[in-house]
């Protein structure tokens, strides 16, 4: 999860913070929406790779060491972590730290509620924990985007120039993230 978040921060969030403030509010929202769609595509790719990687590893090392049922919750946790991270960065970009605090409070509350439910149901295992993280991340991310007013799937024009500029900024950060890890 942390490696996926670091790569997405380098490829998307850092360019968003560098590019968006240079424009007026409407263009800034359009840039951020286009970058969100790009980040969503990257997250789906990372989630798919995580899903297939867990299944392949489970098959090789045995289901006892790494159950294949871990694949779905982990892949969804990658998507939830991404949604929450993007909502946080966008709220910080808009200089709304109270919304970031509300988003983090919601996330932590949902994770703790899910873990408490797992303990109460005597069902607390790896799949349950990743499921709690996924659910909390997706809920907090959706709430955060809704609160900031970003509509990433609306019409925001063509994104080629934004993607080109983001790649020009992010391509140098990705190798440093890989080396750091």
Question: What does each model-identified segment do?
Answer:
Residues 12-16, 53, 87-88, 114-115, ...:
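Hydrophobic/aromatic residues in alpha-helical transmembrane segments
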Residues 36, 40, 71-75, 98-105, ...:
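Hydrophobic faces of transmembrane alpha-helices in multi-pass small-molecule transporters and flippases
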Residues 36-63, 73, 113-120, 142:
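Alpha-helical transmembrane segments of multi-pass membrane transport and lipid-handling proteins
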Residues 44, 48, 52, 63-87, ...:
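Alpha-helical transmembrane segments of multi-pass membrane proteins
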Residues 67-75, 101-151:
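Hydrophobic alpha-helical transmembrane segments
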């Amino acid at each position: 999860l942390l490696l996926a978040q670091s790569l997405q921060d380098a490829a998307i969030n850092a360019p968003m913070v560098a590019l968006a403030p240079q424009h007026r509010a409407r263009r800034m929202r359009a840039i951020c929406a286009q970058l969100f769609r790009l980040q969503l595509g990257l997250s789906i790719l990372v989630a798919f790779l995580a899903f297939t990687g867990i299944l392949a590893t489970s098959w090789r090392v045995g289901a006892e060491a790494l159950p294949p049922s871990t694949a779905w919750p982990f892949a969804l946790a990658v998507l939830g972590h991404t949604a929450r991270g993007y909502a946080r960065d966008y709220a910080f970009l808009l200089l709304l730290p109270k919304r970031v605090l509300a988003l983090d409070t919601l996330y932590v509350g949902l994770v703790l509620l899910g873990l408490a439910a797992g303990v109460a149901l005597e069902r607390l295992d790896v799949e349950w924990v990743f499921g709690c993280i996924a659910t909390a991340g997706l809920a907090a991310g959706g709430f955060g985007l809704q609160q900031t007013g970003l509509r990433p799937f609306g019409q925001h024009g063509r994104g080629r120039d934004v993607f080109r500029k983001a790649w020009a900024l992010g391509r140098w950060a990705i190798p440093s993230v890989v080396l750091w890890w």
